[in-house]
Amino acid sequence: MAERILIVEDEEKLARFIELELLHEGYAVEKAADGRDGLEKAQAGGVDLVLLDVMLPGMSGMELLRRLRRASDVPVIMVTARDAVMDKVTGLDTGADDYITKPFEIEELLARIRAALRKRGGAAQGAEGLTCGAL
């Protein structure tokens, strides 16, 4: 089954561009155009990764991130025009796994998605495969 990515982005052209690239890469995609819809879709379950804008109608991306972190460890990559160092620090300290600023190269975003999904899958897989012999 394809990994499912939720795009929470209010700029429709950008959301559609990212969606098409992700579909081309073999991911399943769901979109939300505002923070409240994004929260509902994320809480419904089955999401493997969230791409999250900061400036959203209805609920800010930071508030959505705070609420997600209360109940979930799903990887979240912030995708935003907010490029000040303190914006990045706030996003990462609030619980984002990664932070990329607009404009971005799609190849970099795809690489960051693969890395975040690898980390999520690798933690569970790696724990079973590690053993320590006699010391």
Tell me what each language-model feature is.
Residues 53, 80:
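Active-site residues of response regulator receiver
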